[in-house]
Amino acid sequence: MSDSTPTEAAVAESNTAGNEATTNSDKASPETTTTSTTEPGNTAKTAAAERMARFRALQARAKTSSDQNLKAATAESRREASDPSQLTALHRRHAIASHKILKADVEESGGDFERKRAWDWTAEESERWDKRVKKKEAARDNNAFQDYRHEAEKIYKRQLKNMPPDMERYAKDKMAAIDKAAAAGTLDIVETEDGELIAVDRAGTFYSTTDSTDFAKNKPDKEAIDRLVNDMKKAEDVAAKKRKARMAKNGEDDDVTYINDKNKQFNQKLARFYNKYTAEIRESFERGTMI
């Protein structure tokens, strides 16, 4: 009896523990079910809120883009409606009128207009302005055609004026030439007391002379070649436009049958006397029936 009593007690304890576990599991199951049904609802609400926020952001971005496009289109239409040449002429006329009014007021008060106007400029600025005006007047007086050499010189100077120097490329090529000469031993790099580096040409061969041919080794970059091609195309377009305008002015829309003005006059004289005899022959040649 004493041996069976502990076994029965253990079985009873195990049954009691099992009943408590079952009770606890039954109590916990509703909570688990409630949690599982609540989390998907919160996730759906959060996703809907995020989608609505993104939609509102897209709406605001679309409205901003529309407003910017409208402003750009309005500015473009205003810019196209205004003629730049007319605005320049208007500013010029305004400046001339202001100059005349100021001159009249000064002369009416008994003062010297040129002297008063010179107060606003320094001597160096006045000299530069006089030199510029003189150069401009000389260019205007020298506008007439003289000979082809002079015309080519004017075109060359105008092209040089429209071609700014590339100082960055110049400095790069200069440093490359100095490094090459220093590596070859023909150029010495000397450091002064201030720490400045000076290149000394002891052999006298670094700088170009009249006998130098190093310029023939220069290879232009792609941008320079493209600029040359564009300039040539512009020149051809301008020449074709002038030729077309000249032909339209003279009423010559047909084929060109002359090589210069003298030959043109001779052809016109022949046409006055012989067109009535050669009209049928020329038409036959054009149709190809003469052959």
UniProtKB/Swiss-Prot annotation:
GO terms for biological process: mRNA processing; RNA splicing. Residues 30-40 have a biased composition (Low complexity). It is found in: Nucleus. One of its GO terms (cellular component) is post-mRNA release spliceosomal complex. Pfam families: SYF2. The keyword tRNA processing does not apply. Residues 1-27, 62-71 have a biased composition (Polar residues). This is Pre-mRNA-splicing factor SYF2. It comes from Pyricularia oryzae (strain 70-15 / ATCC MYA-4617 / FGSC 8958).
